[in-house]
């Protein structure tokens, strides 16, 4: 008689049945049975240097594939280290399954070494958090974890595996992965949306991350081009319409009122496509009572007093947009939007022409854009550079500029770039971070060297937590406090981890340095001093723009 598999072995069988081909994590004493089951499977396990890095890797894997990325830790401090990355996936809508080891069930009712109630700890930051307490339920628990992570608005889920349960024989098998069928919108809602759009005087499309997750870029672009409607995207929806399309008015989301806010000030109808309030609140783009909102998404609208749609078109986003195109009619160009775009383009080109050093943010991004192909990938960390990337980095395809903007986690870029390059080895992948964010997960460069994943990291060096400094200066008459620090020699630090290290001292050096770095077969780190005096200049400039509108 064939020996029955253990719970750990069946769990790994379930992961394989879900299509898992890679996992990120750190082994621990309570996960030993699981580790050896993974060793005997077809799954590639990548040991990282901090569990947060594993969670961010799984997060970006999920964003780019639409399939849940999987991260693993042991109990106690290993699990608490996962929390930031898991929370990031939860709020940013990235499918992720976190698996944690746990003490045996006999120790759970007692004060015990490294024991925390992990199921309860993960509940507020996941769509579902469950512990396997009976071996015969492993198939159902794993299937439900992946189903919840990937269905509707994606997000994080959690599975907790006690040490003694992992060793027990399990009378269980993987459950069949059922294909999720698309839901189509109510035709009466389609017709109502088409009527509102046809009669609108100054409509604006607000495209959010849900449109990217639903692969609706082609439909959004066709809606804009055929009905002559300007498009503004959130940070996580950069590239949903090519930013060189004449109807693209780029990105909303920086703390200041920007040119694009003028569109919303004039708008009588906002067509919100895949819009997620967690990323950009209605107050930020200026929702008001006399504005008609059309909500188009795969999920109903969130409840918010400033976001009350006149009609909700809930179903497959692309199909909904194509159905609206069959019934909506508009003629004439949005002259104000087109003129505003010309002003924005001219200003961006002028800012990008500055060749002083320390380099200006707009110039750095213009040079990066010249080196990167249209489908190459930039992964932004969180900091001042994120605001400049949102405003000045041109994108032409979805998922070519990844930004954490729901949870907005520092330390996201290096693990994220690792996952992106792992998935797309043929593409250039660039992590862009500040010196603050770099130090939060720089250790994963060693992981990249060991696993032969050669992406490039671009550090904007200003020796401060620049975004907080900018906010302090805005709110406290130019003063700041507790945001400055010193840095190690990043070039030498990179070389110590067997990466290539570079430092740019002149503006004209950045492009050739980037080109050389992308030719390397190991990870590279480029340090570029940045002039963030541009931050307050931008603040004052935008105040003047709004005063004159």
What are these regions (language model features)?
Residues 1-328, 367, 371-377, 454-457, ...:
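N-terminal alpha/beta PP-like core and its mobile active-site loop of ThDP/TPP-dependent enzymes
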Residues 11, 16, 31-35, 342-420, ...:
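Active-site diphosphate/adenylate-binding microenvironment
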Residues 30, 53, 215, 359-360, ...:
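A generic structural signal for residues located within well-ordered alpha-helices
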Residues 99, 107-114, 303-306, 312-314, ...:
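Thiamine diphosphate
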Residues 183, 354, 358, 480-483:
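Short, surface-exposed loop/turn motifs that are enriched in glycine and acidic residues
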Residues 224, 253, 264, 361, ...:
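Active-site-proximal structural scaffolding
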